[in-house]
Amino acid sequence: MDLKKAALDYHLFPKPGKLSVESSKPCLTQQDLSLAYTPGVAEPVKEIHKDPSNAYKYTNKGNLIAVITNGTAVLGLGNMGALASKPVMEGKAVLFKRFADIDVFDIEINAKTSDEFIQTVVNIAPTFGGINLEDIAAPECFYIEKELKKKLDIPVFHDDQHGTAVVVAAGLINALEIQSKKLEEVKIVFLGAGAAGCSCARLLKSMGARNIIMVDRQGVLDKNRSNLHEINIDLAIEPSAIKTLDDAMQDADVFIGVSAA
């Protein structure tokens, strides 16, 4: 099978894209439409105005997630821009719907700065019951997530961090059990120190892992490196002779690859 052709055809036919919007209420008669829109729609508007929590009662807010990106870290492709990231965001929406029956709007934001991105999300947040951040480059992603959690009253989840970390932790627990090894005793090497790698390592540390070495394209993260951000520094080892991936892999028990390199 020609994978490229199959993937492009899948996205093109029978109509472009992977998502559509369907009504959850009957809209066949004049009476239906007068309830769906004016004049009937004014009644839930007034109820929500009196008590904002009624939005969860009379609208789809409680089952609607925003999958949001700026396209700066798309899959292993890098900074592809907001528009080119749309197929991935639609794909994540499909997963939400297929496996949890949660509705999604995919939103791709052209933002020049992290603060501009944050403000855009804050401005549209009333529509949604939760925010799923996706494919945002590190270290900006850490700041964006932290600020949105401060500003919003709905859940904020960065999939590349937390989704990956949960899956990696679950897999490692099972693998270590099969090998009769303990998390606090094994040597773990990460290739990749971006959003996914850092989040995985932080979760494993919180679970008891003590010997973790992070490696990125410039080598081992140690505290002598001047180009580390605050999350990297927290995971960096003390300066030593361990400088490369080959060095780090000596006597390693676990290798976790979270890099396109």
Predicted region positions:
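Short, exposed beta-strand "edge-strand" segments with a Pro/Gly-rich flavor and a Y/T-containing core
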Residues: E22-C27, D106, N110, E177, ...
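Glycine-rich, charged/polar anion/phosphate-binding loops
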Residues: H49-N54, S199-C200, S240-I242, A261
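Transmembrane alpha-helical segments of multi-pass membrane transport proteins and ion-pumping complexes
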Residues: P139-F142, C198, V258
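Short beta->alpha junction loops/turns
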Residues: P26, N110, A137, Q161, ...
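Rossmann-fold NAD(P) dinucleotide-binding segment
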Residues: I144-K151, I242-D251, A261
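N-terminal ligand-binding/catalytic initiation module
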Residues: M1-V156
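Short, well-ordered coil/turn residues at beta-beta hairpins
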Residues: E134, G257-V258
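Glycine-rich phosphate/diphosphate-binding loop of Rossmann-like nucleotide-binding domains
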Residues: L75, A82-A100, H158, H162, ...
